[in-house]
Amino acid sequence: RRSTRAFLPEQVREAELQAVLEAGIYAPSATNQQPWHFTVIQKKGIIDRLSDDFKAQARKSESDYIRSVGENEKFHVFYNAPTVIMVSGDQSRHSAAVDCAAAVQNMLIQAESMGIGSCWVGFIAYLINSPEGEHYLKELEIPEGFKQIHSVALGYKRLKPANPPARKENAVNYIR
């Protein structure tokens, strides 16, 4: 699986979208709490507004890196994907972030198995969980008591991915 950052404008077919969502819904979670909520956005205007608002927020960041992302006119936080899946987590569950990460990974792998491109996008939480972005919680119908954790940009690949970068060596040791 590789991150896709160039998408065709064609919308993901409904059956494929449902298969991706089902993979997320069936992800493992601590004590089977399933502390996630998925919000599917396919309205280009909302996706673009989220990106623009993220960039405006990023330009105010104390982090040089985040500020540079916000200042990049060509950057789109969702890489112009036609579908975005926002993944929010129940704030009362101590493992919500990790459980939601498992759901995201399942969705990414399912998408790839069907030839659909995807990219894990965490930046958007920087906006949604800020005072400037909290109105999105209501607009996107994120349930009360949940906060934005991860998101997935989803769509058909515009380009074939290049060869993957080398993996770090010595990432595994064995004790037998």
Model-predicted regions and their roles:
Residues 1-176:
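Acidic, surface-exposed loops and disordered segments
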